[in-house]
Amino acid sequence: MSQAEFEKAAEEVKNLKTKPADDEMLFIYSHYKQATVGDINTERPGILDLKGKAKWDAWNGLKGTSKEDAMKAYINKVEELKKKYGI
């Protein structure tokens, strides 16, 4: 998997005909962050920020995953979503 394939997938996911389910969006978000930033580097959001906590927890769950593995999983998930939702 190359950086170019990853960047293409990042653009394609924005053009899906239907918004993916929340769990699919968390997968996409967390793997994108792991691939581009690496291990989480922020504090967990406060108790009232439910969406922020869900995103933080999903990204934190990937701690230790290599950028390459996160990139590969991201690309594979986008391909799956393209088949499911169309672009």
From Swiss-Prot:
Binds medium- and long-chain acyl-CoA esters with very high affinity and may function as an intracellular carrier of acyl-CoA esters. It is also able to displace diazepam from the benzodiazepine (BZD) recognition site located on the GABA type A receptor. It is therefore possible that this protein also acts as a neuropeptide to modulate the action of the GABA receptor. Monomer. The modification N-acetylserine is found at residue 2. The modification Phosphotyrosine is found at residue 29. This is Acyl-CoA-binding protein. It holds the Pfam family ACBP. Residues 2-87 form the ACB domain. The keyword Acetylation applies. It is found in: Endoplasmic reticulum; Golgi apparatus. An acyl-CoA binds at residues 14, 29-33, 51, 55, 74. Belongs to the ACBP family. GO terms for cellular component: endoplasmic reticulum; Golgi apparatus. The modification N6-malonyllysine is found at residue 55. One of its GO terms (biological process) is defense response to bacterium. One of its GO terms (molecular function) is fatty-acyl-CoA binding. The modification N6-(2-hydroxyisobutyryl)lysine is found at residue 55. The modification N6-acetyllysine is found at residues 8, 19, 51, 55, 77. Keywords: Acetylation, Antibiotic, Antimicrobial, Endoplasmic reticulum, Golgi apparatus, Hydroxylation, Lipid-binding, Phosphoprotein, Transport. It comes from Sus scrofa. Coiled coil: none annotated. Gene3D superfamilies: 1.20.80.10. The modification N6-succinyllysine is found at residues 8, 17, 55, 77. The keyword Endoplasmic reticulum applies.
